[in-house]
Amino acid sequence: MKEKLALALLSFFLGLGSFFSFYVAPTLFKVLERQQAGAVVEKVFPVYFGLGIILVGISLFLGRDSGKLFLSLGILNLLLLLLQEFIVIPKLHGLKATNYELFLKYHGVSMGINLAILLLTLGKVLILIFKR
């Protein structure tokens, strides 16, 4: 039962993250001015990563008996979410107004971390699916 709930939480986060990262964010930048789209994304990302911290944290607790690989991926996933929420996103926010060139570099790093978060989440989902 605990693993099914962990699977549901991780699947929800994976779907949410994929939808936002690969559809919503790019669409915002296509239909809105860059500044407007950036303002929207700037408000959404802390909620997205905060929710990820909660869901991944709960799933890590619920799936603690799912093996070392699940735990390792879960801990790394949680650390990357914390990094995004409390270090990278605030740094990006500050750089956007002061050093746009450096902002773009950090933005690339942030995108890579987000992709890693989604891939780690997918890995944990697959572990739980195939563990059955």
Swiss-Prot record:
It comes from Aquifex aeolicus (strain VF5). It is found in: Cell membrane. Its main location: membrane. This is Uncharacterized protein aq_125. Keywords: Cell membrane, Membrane, Transmembrane, Transmembrane helix. The chain crosses the membrane at residues 7-29, 44-62, 69-88, 108-130. One of its GO terms (cellular component) is plasma membrane. It is a multi-pass membrane protein.
